[in-house]
Amino acid sequence: MPTVTVAVITHNRKELLKSCLSSLINGTLLPDEIRVYDNASTDGTAEMLKCEFPQVKVFENKENFGLSYCHNQALSSFTTDSLLLLDDDNIVAPDMLEKLLKKLFSDQKLGIVLPLFMNGYDDPKTVCFCGGETSLWSGRNILRDKNFPKEQETYPTYRVPNATLIKKEAAQATGLMDDRLFSTMADEDYCRRMAKLGYRAEFLLSAVTDHMQEVKRSDARRLGLTNPLQTYIFARNRAVLIKRYGMLFQFLVFMLFWQPLYHLYYLFNMLRYRAPGSFLKAYLAGIVDSISHAFTGNLPSLSDIRQRFN
């Protein structure tokens, strides 16, 4: 069996992390190495890990640098045949890792494989996510049909969140994630870069993880109106992704027609939810940076972004 490192990303979710690690350790295939990347938790996560999971290697970040930053920490240093990037809000099925590994190494051109995400929060029988992509015309989310035939084995995807098993050779060829994207769409950007090298990403529908986050979210949360940094990312990242991977005509259609509609919708919701002025300032900064990226291809560094919106 190929070797595997599991890298769990966490921030102030000690109890979720404990359940996640327990499910990994009690599976049919024990990972060769388990790492936890702690994004500056203040809830006693570090102490819990030292006490209850001494076999886990812990990396403590002094600030919350986002998912992509932690993913890059793991991608740049693992030495096994594969790497599972796992969020702390998963309770994996006992055979999930074993099934993913077998599938990943059954096909030379399969670079990434993911499990089916079930709604572990309140209805474990319900599928909450099984793949998708961003439309390069409109920027909207295109999600795979959750009512798939029982005999179907896989779904292709460009969205690779939450529990992503990556083959080492594909990771080495693709390089690191763009941490300037912070979280939203950074996974799709990475997957599309990998696809250009000839590697596919697929959901293995027989492998399962229970996603323990609440699926029903408020509109404010769904729109990123939770903090200025997330608002900035929502304003910017669609345009960045379409600029990088769409044709010129697709990008022009998006920027001249769809993007203004998105902006009007988000600005309306800022008024509706009475978002503070800092949110409006962040959103306008995202618009400016998306336009700047269209002409120059440049984006502010992760440290610059954090200084502006923290």
Positions of PLM-derived features:
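Short, acidic, metal-binding catalytic loop of nucleotide-sugar glycosyltransferases
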Residues: 22-31
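A conserved acidic beta->alpha catalytic loop
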Residues: 23, 38-47, 63
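Short beta-strand/loop segment that forms part of the nucleotide-sugar
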Residues: 32-40, 59-60
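Glycine-rich, basic loop-to-helix element that forms the pyrophosphate-binding segment
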Residues: 61-78
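Short aromatic/hydrophobic "clamp" motif used to bind/position activated sugar donors
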Residues: 83
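Acidic/His-rich active-site region of diverse nucleotide-sugar glycosyltransferases
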Residues: 91-176, 180
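A short, conserved alpha-helix in the catalytic core of glycosyltransferases
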Residues: 158, 163-166, 170-175, 180-208
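Non-catalytic, C-terminal membrane-associated alpha-helical segments of glycosyltransferases
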Residues: 247-310
